[in-house]
Every structure is written in C-alpha cells, then in structure tokens.
C-alpha cells in the first residue's frame, strides 16, 4: 500500500496493534539497482529534513516509535504530522511519549545498505536524550560489514540534526570521500545551535517535567523558558522571559550575539502546529542575517513536540567556525542532485 498510516488507523479501530512494519520497497529497489553515490546517509525520524532530500535514493530513515496509551506508531512512516497533532490533542490526560527504534530496525537497514554502498553514515538523535544511538551501535555487532558503517551522535534533535543532514547530503552528492564527510559532520555537530521557545507550559506540567507548583508560579508571572541543546546534547534552559512574544525577540537577539547583525549561516525552523510563528522567524532571520541556503520550515518531530506541546518553535543555525569557516563547507545551495526516479515495485526484494 502507498498509505500505511491509513491501513494502521483502520486496523487500530479493531484492537491494539502489537507490531508495525513499513518498508519503502521502491526506494530499496532504487538503492539496489540505481545507486549513484558511494555513501548512503541514514537518519532517524527525530531528524527533521525536507521531503525533497528524504526522497533521494541514498537517504534512508529509521522511524522512532511514538506511543499514545497502549498504541505505538512508526513516526513519519505511518504517522503524519496531521494525525500526530490529532492524537496529541485527544490524549489530554496521558501525554504521548517516544521510544527508540528496535535494534533490529537498524540491523536490517545497515545490512541492506552495506550490500549496495561502499560506506554508510548514520546521524543519530542526541545520545543524551535517547537510547537511539545505542540501539544503532548494538546493531553493528550483528552485521558482517560493520567497518563500513559510521555512527555519529548529532547531539541534537529536529531541525538541528536536519541542518547537519542537509550538508551531509550535499557532500555525498559531490562525491566527497567518507573521511571528509565524517569530518565535516563532526565539525557541524559542535557548531549547531538549537533555540526553542515554548508559549505554553501545559505540556511540561502534564508530563511532570515541570512541577505543578513551579508551573503555577511561572504562569502567574508569565514566565516562559527558552531552551537549548548544550555541548553534551542535553536540553537545558537558555533563559527565562516574560511572555511568548518576548521569547521570540530574545531568540533573534541570541542569534545576533552569536553571528552578529548580517551574519551568514544556515538556518531552519521547526514548529508544533504553528506555521505562523515559523514564518515570523523566517522573516526576521532574512531581515537581520544572511542565510547561506534556503530556510526550510518543518513540523517538529514528536521527539520534541510530545514534550513541549502546541505552539512550540525551534530555530537551528550553525555558529561560525573558530577558524573563519569550516573547510568542509559546500558551495552549493542545497538543491544539487535529483530525487530517485520511479521504479517498478519489487516486493520480494530488499529488507525483509
């Protein structure tokens, strides 16, 4: 089927689905028969990357599990943003959670890709936030060509990881050797910044991440946290502001302190069902800074959204290199290359 989300939705009306499995047979066929790069890129669904990049033959995704009640969903493969928002609204008493992919999911992906590519790079959700990278490492012990797989902790989430992945796509298409690709990714991991504004404290209080008493005091004082990802990949408080509007302006101010007015960098914005705030950030970034590539806007991964709630926005960018710019930076605008062309479905081929 071309719509696994609908199949799982209907099946879920008749009981709890104990296991879900989605394979992109078309992409597997293309990777096996039309691979035109030496390196494949693997991300998990906590990495928010534009669809046109996800469609490329050499880009593959391992889905994170999203859990509401007793039901588990495969993020992005069988759970669209619209359906996720619907579930997030309906489960008001019990917040949704996320769970790392099974080791077997990585094992199948790595085994398949190492059979068709010289090298495989997995850019994973921050290891300080999830066991996803650990699951990927466990999978390496189960495949023959483990030396062909590089596992890199993004120390980030959502569009923070997405910005790094976009550069990796460019380098792979440019035919760079795996050593240069790894070095470039590792450099960007250390320079990627993610700033998060949360207009409502409801999700933080409901999930227990913010105590009810402290949450009530914060609400009375109209205090809102700005969050960021630190150098270890942990979510930490960057600042406290009075009101959501002040939070938006503070993020622009923080970026200005890092880049300077008119500073050049890559940017991306994620949001939780709040396209308006995302467009506001894009306009302000274009006004005050010099985007090196197009600013992509995406729905935030459930890995962020389940914890922060509706209205959240996250802005990602690269800090300048200490040496005036990374030697790994690409010159393209991020649009090089083409997506995979249509190919016959070979149901019996690819990942089992």
Regions found by a protein language model. Name each.
Residues 40-105:
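N-terminal glycine-rich anion-binding loop in soluble enzyme alpha/beta folds
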């Amino acid at each position: 089927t071309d719509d696994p989300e609908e199949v799982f939705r209907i099946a879920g009306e008749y009981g709890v689905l104990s296991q879900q499995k989605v394979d992109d047979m078309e992409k597997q066929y293309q990777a096996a028969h039309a691979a035109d790069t030496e390196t494949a890129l693997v991300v998990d669904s906590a990495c928010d990357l534009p669809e046109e990049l996800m469609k490329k033959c050499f880009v593959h995704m391992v889905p994170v599990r999203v859990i509401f009640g007793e039901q588990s969903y495969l993020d992005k493969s069988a759970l669209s943003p619209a359906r996720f928002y619907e579930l997030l609204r309906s489960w008001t008493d019990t917040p949704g959670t996320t769970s790392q992919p099974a080791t077997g999911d990585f094992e199948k992906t790595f085994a398949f890709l190492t059979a068709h590519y010289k090298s495989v790079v997995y850019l994973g959700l921050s290891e300080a936030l999830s066991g996803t990278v650990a699951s990927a490492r466990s999978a390496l012990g189960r495949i023959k060509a483990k030396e062909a797989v590089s596992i890199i902790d993004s120390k980030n989430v959502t569009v923070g990881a997405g910005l790094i992945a976009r550069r990796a796509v460019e380098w792979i298409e440019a035919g760079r050797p795996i050593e240069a690709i790894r070095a470039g990714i590792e450099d960007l991991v250390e320079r990627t910044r993610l700033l998060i504004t949360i207009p409502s404290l409801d999700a933080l209080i409901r999930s227990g991440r913010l105590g009810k008493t402290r949450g009530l005091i914060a609400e009375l004082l109209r205090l809102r946290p700005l969050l960021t990802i630190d150098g270890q990949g942990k979510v930490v408080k960057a600042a406290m502001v009075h009101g959501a509007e002040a939070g938006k302006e503070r993020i622009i101010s923080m970026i200005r302190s890092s880049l300077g007015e008119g500073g050049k960098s890559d940017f991306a914005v994620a949001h939780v069902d709040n396209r308006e705030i995302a467009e506001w950030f894009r306009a302000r970034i274009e006004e005050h800074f010099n985007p090196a590539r197009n600013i992509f806007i995406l729905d935030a991964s459930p890995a962020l959204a389940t914890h922060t709630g509706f209205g959240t926005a996250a802005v990602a960018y690269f800090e300048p290199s200490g040496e005036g710019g990374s030697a790994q930076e690409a010159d393209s605008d991020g649009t090089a290359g083409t997506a995979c062309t249509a190919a016959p479905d070979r149901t019996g081929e690819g990942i089992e």
